[in-house]
A protein has these predicted regions:
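Class I S-adenosyl-L-methionine
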Residues: 1-214
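C-terminal target-recognition/interaction regions appended to catalytic cores
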Residues: 122-317
């Protein structure tokens, strides 16, 4: 639940206010409130994005329609275990085995042989978003490829290789310690971390990272960094939660971070929705500018929002 240290969380406080009556009047409306944790990937969005919701129906309407709420929070994943919760719980729109992946979302942008356009057809044709979004451009907007130095690209390729080999990127942190101290203990830790690494080491775009173990260790030492939060996407899995800063997510096969359009695909924005403003900004400008990556990362996924809105409409109509 939402409580922490035996105190009500802000969500619980809001829930209690809604249930007891909003406002100071004796006639203030009361609500039947359902606590929810809904994951966007259960509603046709190719992204692991669990979020907490409070869905409330005015009590007098709920009583007429026999609508009730569960006493505990309902998770959208519960549905796959046969728990449908209460009438206020939005049922997932996709089977667990059919949860969409990174490749479903952006495969057409980097794989010429990709013919799986089902998700794109839903986004761009069947979603009905075109009824409310005006768009005249034919070319794909917001798809400017990110520029990186050769060293950063080399590090990205190593991240991709490590992900494929099941090697933790924390080895870079160990390498930083060795570079700073020359302590052989750290060198042996690197050797241990790479003991099962397959060589020659190749990146997904067929670049040779290292021809043998010694060269692989040298490459790790060359690219050492204390930052190991960056990770490549896995093409066969949903995207991790899209956030407003793009630096930590690496393309599954190319040596770069993601474009605004690719992140927007993960969020289920149709291709004809164009993001304005600068791509990124920083410092004091963040107070006045909302860059494109922030617009994408802070949004509720449109397909998920549509499901919830339709569910509420069905409840009260």
């Amino acid at each position: 639940r939402f409580n922490k240290h035996n105190e009500d969380s802000p969500f619980q406080k809001i829930k209690k206010v809604l249930e007891s009556g909003v406002g100071n009047s004796e006639n203030s409306p009361q609500y039947i409130v359902q606590e929810l944790q809904l994951n966007a990937m259960h509603y046709g969005v190719p992204q692991h994005r669990p979020r907490v919701f409070l869905l409330g129906i005015r009590k007098d309407i709920a009583e007429v329609k026999s609508l009730t709420a569960t006493t505990d929070i309902w998770f959208s994943s519960n549905f796959f275990d046969g728990n449908i919760g209460s009438p206020l719980c939005p049922i997932p729109t996709i089977k667990e085995k059919d949860i969409l992946s990174v490749y479903d979302a952006i495969g057409d942008l980097y794989d010429e042989e990709n013919r799986n356009l089902k998700y794109l057809n839903i986004l761009n044709k069947k979603s009905a978003f075109k009824k409310v979004i005006k768009h005249k451009k034919e070319e794909l907007s917001n798809h400017n490829l990110r520029n990186h130095s050769d060293k950063i690209k080399k590090r990205f390729r190593l991240y991709q290789y490590f992900s494929e080999q099941g090697i933790s990127t924390k080895v870079f942190n160990i390498a930083s310690k060795y570079n700073a101290t020359s302590d052989k203990v750290y060198y042996h830790e690197i050797e241990k971390a790479l003991v099962n690494a397959k060589v020659p080491a190749l990146s997904p775009d067929d670049m040779v990272i290292a021809r043998d173990k010694n060269e692989l260790i040298d490459t790790v030492l060359e690219l050492a960094t204390k930052k190991h939060s960056q990770r490549p996407l896995k093409a066969i899995e949903p995207s991790p939660t899209v956030v407003s800063i793009p630096d930590d997510v690496i393309h599954p096969t190319l040596a770069r971070t993601m474009t605004v359009r690719e992140q927007a695909r993960f969020q289920s924005f149709p291709d004809y929705f164009e993001f304005k403003s600068k791509e990124t900004t920083g410092g004091a400008m963040r107070k006045v500018d909302v860059p494109q990556y922030t617009q994408v990362g802070n949004a509720v996924p449109p397909l998920m929002a549509k499901v919830i809105a339709q569910h509420i409409k069905d409840l009260i109509s």
